Amino acid sequence: MKDPIDLYMNTLVPMVVEQTSRGERAYDIFSRMLKERIIFLSGPVHDGMSSLICAQLLFLEAENPSKEIAMYINSPGGVVTSGLSIYDTMQYIRPKVSTLVIGQAASMGSLLLTAGEKGMRFSLPNSRVMVHQPSGGYQGQATDIMIHARETEKLKRRLNEIYVKHTGQDLDTVEAALERDNFMSAEDAKAWGLIDEILESRGKTDDTAK
């Protein structure tokens, strides 16, 4: 049984109070960041998270289709199809989306990191990036297992094509790099083409990376 105090502390979201012409207004911290066009992609990627992220992207596009969106990523990865729904939405909307990894961008997290606008993909100095091929566990009749295995192969090929598109690496290099868990430092990720720049302080990129 989970400790109720731990559960409370882990789900406690800070509130911020803003003064307006109509008085005070309270926001949870993530809603306040959304007003600044900042989206936090934090934790495992799953259908619930992808729905929230896609909704935020579409909302910000509707508010201003020409103003950039900043996405902060700290994720171990997760469900491939959920991640692809976020990826497709990032490519679909009109605003440019900058990405910044804080902590880690592993598995689908790394794909979403490199899916940011070219020249606007960043990492903090001590962040880690990990790429690998998709995996899955299936059970049931042998025929069904074979069907799922073929689907996983198709997803693997599609993911490889996306990495090729955004990193500039050739297909053979991507396939070799994703064969096993491949951990990278920020410097390695930049050299491989997953990101464009390593940020140590806001400086001149303040307006782009938020």
UniProtKB/Swiss-Prot annotation:
Catalytic site: S107 (nucleophile), H132
Q: Name one GO cellular component term.
A: cytoplasm
Q: Which GO terms describe its biological process?
A: protein quality control for misfolded or incompletely synthesized proteins
Question: Where found, per UniProt?
Answer: Cytoplasm
| Keywords, sorted A to Z | Cytoplasm, Hydrolase, Protease, Serine protease
Stretches that traverse the bilayer = none
- Annotated InterPro entries: ClpP, ClpP/crotonase-like_dom_sf, ClpP/TepA, ClpP_His_AS, ClpP_Ser_AS
The entry sums up its family as follows: Belongs to the peptidase S14 family.
Subunit structure, briefly? Answer: Fourteen ClpP subunits assemble into 2 heptameric rings which stack back to back to give a disk-like structure with a central cavity, resembling the structure of eukaryotic proteasomes.
What is the recorded name of this protein?
ATP-dependent Clp protease proteolytic subunit
Which species expresses this protein natively? Cereibacter sphaeroides (strain ATCC 17025 / ATH 2.4.3) (Rhodobacter sphaeroides)
